[in-house]
Amino acid sequence: MTDTLSRLAEVLESRKDAAADSSYVASLYHKGLNKILEKLGEESIETIIAAKDAAVSGNCSDVIYETADLWFHSMVMLAALGQHPQAVLDELDRRFGLSGHAEKAARTAE
């Protein structure tokens, strides 16, 4: 799984200096973080709607498709902020085996 994320991160990084009209990602970078966040919000809503529909229909193909869009745009956001998806994977590894209640309590204590 991480190989796919690493390869995508490399492509996203390479688009940062590309001409705006050369790719969708390059155009997002040129429009700035607010546009990237707008797209991320749209994809979040589309994922939620797809999940609600899947709960009724039993067909998860749309929720998988929309989740891929959500992950993709999350990675564009991370790249725009100079972060690699490995940082998110490291955070998930840190939380693995940690009680959700304990993790939340640790955050609120800080």
Swiss-Prot record:
HAMAP family: HisE. One of its GO terms (biological process) is L-histidine biosynthetic process. GO terms for cellular component: cytoplasm. GO terms for molecular function: ATP binding; phosphoribosyl-ATP diphosphatase activity. It is found in: Cytoplasm. The lineage of its organism: Bacteria, Pseudomonadati, Pseudomonadota, Gammaproteobacteria, Pseudomonadales. Its main location: cytoplasm. Gene3D superfamilies: MazG-like (1.10.287.1080). This is Phosphoribosyl-ATP pyrophosphatase. Keywords: Amino-acid biosynthesis, ATP-binding, Cytoplasm, Histidine biosynthesis, Hydrolase, Nucleotide-binding. It comes from Pseudomonas syringae pv. syringae (strain B728a). It catalyses: 1-(5-phospho-beta-D-ribosyl)-ATP + H2O = 1-(5-phospho-beta-D-ribosyl)-5'-AMP + diphosphate + H(+). The gene is hisE. It comes from the Bacteria. Pathway: Amino-acid biosynthesis; L-histidine biosynthesis; L-histidine from 5-phospho-alpha-D-ribose 1-diphosphate: step 2/9. Its EC number is 3.6.1.31. Belongs to the PRA-PH family.
